[in-house]
């Protein structure tokens, strides 16, 4: 019984130390989670249960080791973080203050990616490359950007300040400040709050589904072919009767 109580005491002390360290070194990220996640009820919940925060802690340590030219261990640490959180951030990625990764499973951030301040990313986001080129090959995300679930931002492009990228969009070109991007490939549908002519309704509950759109086009083509076949058969019937 004494041994059990001692173990509980040690675990409690370690948890307290972990909590204090996280509050000191990740205060901006913890505040971001509290502000942007309506499900967050208290700071302790964020510190102990938010995978995005744990992934950032692993990345900060791995990034520092990489800056010190420590071999191998930065990648090992990043892979440990991936295993624990489902979020893969390369040690070479540069991340600003106040990043909030919500849910986080499947998020990938490439080696030369740069993320500014107060960015929000949801599950399934990829900041990736487009080939095997060397040098800067991943996107630069500026400040106050929101990247929806499943979105892919690819290549050495720049996403400007205050940009909203819709869920499942595939962005392969630069995005200007104060824009909203949707679709595959991603296109600007709103800029500075104004709809682009011919743009899409950007109510978040009505963001376009590219697969659904493709199915609708196919169904339209099938209906058209069926109509033509019907007219052809009617013509054949009339010829036979005459």
Feature locations, PLM:
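Terminal amphipathic alpha-helical/low-complexity segments used for targeting or macromolecular assembly
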Residues: 1-80, 196-242
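Structural signal for interior beta-strand "rungs" in well-ordered beta-sheet cores
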Residues: 82-189
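P-loop NTPase switch/communication element
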Residues: 193
């Amino acid at each position: 019984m004494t041994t059990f109580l001692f173990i509980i005491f040690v675990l409690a002390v370690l948890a307290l130390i972990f909590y204090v360290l996280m509050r000191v070194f990740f205060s901006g990220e913890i505040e971001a989670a509290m502000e942007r996640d309506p499900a967050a009820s208290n700071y302790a919940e964020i510190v102990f249960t938010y995978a995005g925060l744990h992934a950032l802690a692993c990345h900060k340590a791995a990034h520092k080791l990489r800056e010190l030219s420590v071999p191998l261990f930065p990648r090992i640490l990043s892979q440990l973080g991936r295993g624990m959180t489902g979020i893969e951030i390369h040690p070479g990625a540069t991340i600003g203050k106040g990043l909030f990764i919500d849910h986080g499973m499947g998020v990938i951030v490439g080696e030369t990616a740069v993320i500014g301040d107060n960015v929000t990313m949801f599950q399934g986001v990829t900041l990736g490359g487009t080939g095997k080129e060397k040098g800067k090959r991943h996107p630069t995300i500026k400040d106050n950007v929101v990247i929806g679930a499943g979105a892919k931002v690819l290549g050495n492009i720049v996403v400007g300040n205050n940009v909203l990228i819709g869920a499942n969009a595939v962005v392969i070109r630069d995005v200007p400040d104060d824009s909203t991007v949707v679709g595959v490939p991603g296109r600007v549908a709103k800029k500075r709050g104004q709809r682009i002519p011919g743009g899409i309704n950007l109510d978040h509950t009505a963001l376009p589904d590219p697969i659904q759109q493709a199915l609708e086009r196919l169904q339209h083509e099938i209906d058209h072919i069926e109509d033509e076949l019907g007219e052809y058969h009617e013509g054949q019937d009339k010829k036979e009767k005459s």
